[in-house]
């Protein structure tokens, strides 16, 4: 074999090796763990909420689960913290029938191809933990599994328990976003021991 043929063969082998490495990196390195969740409708999200509660061993308040009207952007924002819902297919929320309890579990299904982790982060950053006015949610968790996002906010113990139930059912989740809220400080004239006029 002459020198030119040997060089061509070496170049071809090098190119094949580089292509094989790139295929390996993209095929296996970027693969996310598969979600156990298959959601094709708002009813599927409602059923998932029921399954989440089945895995919760602590006492829960009396709750009402509802599918949100996707044309009512203000209501969707109230429950999700999302200003833009163009990439959202369904939203189902579960909250107490008596609104003096700071508790909310919201499941969101985003459209195929949407970065659900980014939406989960936006929800965690923008959800109003004081939306009930007289009470505040102490802890907020959000995470995506496939194209389903879970947001739960309430006291720390309940939030952890409900969120763990979601993660167990999902099988795998992306980035977990967590936020802790402090109780607002009362004005001095409202502190205990102050005279009220």
Language model segments and positions:
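Soluble, non-membrane globular domain cores that form compact, hydrophobic packing
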Residues: 2-104, 110-197
